Amino acid sequence: MKNCVLKGVLALSLASSFALAEGGFAGVEGGYDFNSKLTGGLKDNRPNIGIKGGYDFDIARVYGGYFYHAKAKDSHGSIVDAKWTNHKFVVGGEYTPTITEDWKLIAGLYTGLSTINFNAYNNKGAVIEMYDVTKVGWLLGAKVGGEYSFDKNNALEFGLKTDKTWYPSAYNLDFKSTDVGAYLGYTYKF
């Protein structure tokens, strides 16, 4: 946990240094994963929230951020009462061409680290195993959407994003997760 907090503080300080420059931005984002899947058939819907900051070059931008994905629950086959949450630390780049005076297209890629906390029971008849796993994995994602600027400093961003994470194996479980969802965010431009 200390390691996650340290990485979060480092990412925020990096984002803050970008935000102090001309063209810098900071923002908050909320979303809903309408398809959050783990290897083995486990899936659920769940909300997420995050913060980000970076530098806007007008036609493109770079950013760093932290996103928390709330608890998901499911049972599948012999795995019962599975619950998982994610903490995602990402860096990304986006192409942001102007469509009209107030509208921009957003298309980008991001990568980073994702921490999963997974708890479940495996019911094998007479034997019940309990899993309590925390793993850090590499994620790769993409997003597409739009941005509407109210004025030179305030903007509303919305769209769809998806990412896939590969975690190290634990307890003979090969962890991979995929999240697909919609997001809505507010950005303040300096």
Give the positions of each predicted feature:
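Cleavable N-terminal export/targeting peptides
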Residues: M1-F25
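Outer membrane beta-barrel transmembrane domains
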Residues: G24, G145, E157, G185-T187
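Short N-terminal segments immediately surrounding and downstream of signal-peptide cleavage
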Residues: G24-G40
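Generic short beta-strand segments
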Residues: Y32-F34, Y68-A70, T162-T165
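Gram-negative (and chloroplast) outer-membrane scaffold detector with strong preference
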Residues: I51-A126, W138, Y148-F150, A182-F190
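A charged, solvent-exposed segment within the mature domains of Sec-exported extracytoplasmic proteins
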Residues: N119-D174
